[in-house]
Amino acid sequence: NEGHMKVEGETAYCVDINTGFKNGYKTRHDASASMSAAQIEDVALSLEYVKQYRDSHSNLNANQGYLLEQCVVWQRLSEQLGWKCDNVRAAYSEISQDIQNEVYAGARVFVQTNKGRYKCGGYIYTGEGQDLGQFWAELNVGNAKVKKTTANESITKANAMYSIAGATFGIFADQ
């Protein structure tokens, strides 16, 4: 009923499915004060998947995209917090069952295959009415100097085909 929620111009989501919406002032807290890093990463990566899906599927309008995002937030929080509504969905008249099945299954796979590849965070806004949340996932990037060595110089020495020029590397480590 409340539509597309925003805090200071940025999209926000209901993070308390059992409380009604009220306009008003809220206080912002870092999500890590009430959620584990794994929970934040789960929600943030799920949202990242839905945003990427939405951006690549022009058949979804902005309201449908936001509704899918809100549903995935509720699904992930329900599983984490024991709300017993893990399969919350939009009405099929709003978004088809096939699209919802694809998005929700895709989000789960995306989370599993991308854990640790993104820096994730969030804020929780508390006050009158339901709590709101904002979550983000930023792809970890950086620079590295690559040194190529070989155990078999007879194959690699003066071999123009043996090159790493133009290669793309993904390097991940704990901070």
Model-flagged regions — what are they?
Residues 41-56, 64, 131-175:
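Solvent-exposed loop/turn and edge beta-strand elements of beta-rich ligand-binding domains
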Residues 1-136:
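Short, surface-exposed polybasic-aromatic patches that bind anionic ligands, especially phosphate groups
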